[in-house]
Amino acid sequence: MKVRKGDTVLVISGKDKGAKGKVLVAYPDRNKVLVEGVNRIKKHTPESRTERGASSGGIVTQEAPISVSNVMLLDSDGKPTRVGYRRDDETGKNVRIAKSNGKDI
């Protein structure tokens, strides 16, 4: 999966199309990401249980995971881009690059 925790992404389809946010959690096995302020749902929780963003029970509004195919990574210029890889000569590790401008992400 080319999107990781901490990346800034743009939602390209769905009810929150056009929204920008930071990736809070990435779920590579499910191909989903949790984006800050996107795909908000209302969840009914019991009094004894604590969920994300709630100290006690009741109706809690929180983010739900969104498919990684519905988001696009933003490059250093703030424009949506596809992601590619190149091998770093010094370390020998793969580095993500923005296809739009060729810069490292």
Curated annotation (Swiss-Prot):
One of two assembly initiator proteins, it binds directly to the 5'-end of the 23S rRNA, where it nucleates assembly of the 50S subunit. It holds the Pfam family KOW. Part of the 50S ribosomal subunit. GO terms for molecular function: rRNA binding; structural constituent of ribosome. It comes from Mycolicibacterium vanbaalenii (strain DSM 7251 / JCM 13017 / BCRC 16820 / KCTC 9966 / NRRL B-24157 / PYR-1) (Mycobacterium vanbaalenii). CDD domains: KOW_RPL26 (cd06089). Keywords: Ribonucleoprotein, Ribosomal protein, RNA-binding, rRNA-binding. The keyword DNA-binding does not apply. One of its GO terms (biological process) is translation. One of its GO terms (cellular component) is ribonucleoprotein complex. SMART domains: KOW. PANTHER family: MITOCHONDRIAL RIBOSOMAL PROTEIN L24 (PTHR12903). Belongs to the universal ribosomal protein uL24 family. This is Large ribosomal subunit protein uL24. The keyword Ribonucleoprotein applies. SUPFAM superfamilies: Translation proteins SH3-like domain. It comes from the Bacteria.
